[in-house]
Amino acid sequence: MAKKSMKNRELKRQLTVAKYATKRAALKAIIVDLNASPEARWEATVALQKQPRDASASRMRNRCRLTGRPHGVYRKFGLGRNKLREAAMRGDVPGLVKASW
């Protein structure tokens, strides 16, 4: 089990990313646009750098919804490998069966 503080930190990051997503996308579009003036591109770069670090989506970490485990998380299910296996063995995940050949 991950600490509550780690789970809360990730939740706070998700909210921050969602809050700044549109503004970041607009600034990145200006930076990439070759038709924009160099001054406008520079100002957009500075504005992007002044945003909070946690506003970047690359700082988010996928965690298990049940345990908060940061490694071995399946994106499709949002569960860590251990909890996914337990759920599959109970039959809680439709269409997921243990392999046998």
UniProtKB/Swiss-Prot annotation:
Keyword set, alphabetical order: Ribonucleoprotein, Ribosomal protein, RNA-binding, rRNA-binding
Gene Ontology CC annotations of this record: cytoplasm; small ribosomal subunit
A family per Pfam: Ribosomal_S14
Family in the record: Belongs to the universal ribosomal protein uS14 family.
SUBUNIT field: Part of the 30S ribosomal subunit. Contacts proteins S3 and S10.
Task of the protein: Binds 16S rRNA, required for the assembly of 30S particles and may also be responsible for determining the conformation of the 16S rRNA at the A site.
Protein's UniProt name: Small ribosomal subunit protein uS14
Species whose genome carries this gene: Pseudomonas fluorescens (strain ATCC BAA-477 / NRRL B-23932 / Pf-5)
